[in-house]
Regions:
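Alpha/beta enzyme core
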Residues: 3-167, 171-177
């Protein structure tokens, strides 16, 4: 029903991995870091030219170098056949790292949503509007200075840098973003 009406949903991590793999070419699928490692190691055979896999990597610490490197290897292996959304981040410099890795959508925000458990459990919070402004300003400064901008554009299929998604979080992985 959702797909027929062009409503995007994210299949949560609570759905078994094999089912999520089957749904990847139809809608966005949430993966943990270990799931992405498994996906990166898969030989998917011949991917149809028009087939695209939509993956949202859901991780508490979007600044992890391991995450960025892993996403970069997935993008290098599957190219335009994978659309990656990941995060959350709370640092404009990490946005640039994501762009260089070829990530398509960057989830920005930490502890700012009404249901996000990061602030309550980890004592970490960053005001959403301030953070989005900082990331956007940093993005524009980078493009204006052309510092790394061409490398970032080459990293993924878009002519611009990755899209910014204001993500207020959720209290369990069954929530739709």
């Amino acid at each position: 029903v959702f797909m027929d009406n062009k409503i995007n949903i994210i299949i949560p991590r609570s759905v078994d991995l094999s089912t999520r793999y089957e749904l990847m070419s139809k809608t966005c699928v949430a993966l943990s870091l270990s799931d992405v490692e498994t996906f990166a190691g898969l030989e998917l055979g011949e991917i149809k030219e028009e087939e695209i896999f939509y993956i949202c990597v859901d991780i508490a610490n979007g600044h992890m170098r391991k995450l960025i490197d892993l996403c970069k290897s997935v993008k290098q292996k599957y190219g335009g056949h994978v659309i990656l959304m990941t995060g959350n981040i709370a640092n404009p410099d990490t946005y640039i790292d994501y762009a260089l890795a070829g990530i398509d959508f960057v989830r920005v925000g930490i502890g700012g949503g009404s249901v996000c458990t990061t602030s309550a459990n980890g004592g970490v919070h960053y005001a959403m509007a301030s953070l989005i402004k900082e990331v956007v300003d940093h993005k524009w400064e980078t493009e204006k200075a052309n510092k790394d901008a061409e490398a970032m554009r080459i990293s993924h299929k878009y002519e611009s840098l990755p899209f910014i998604v204001a993500a207020g979080g959720y209290d369990n992985s069954d929530k739709i973003i």
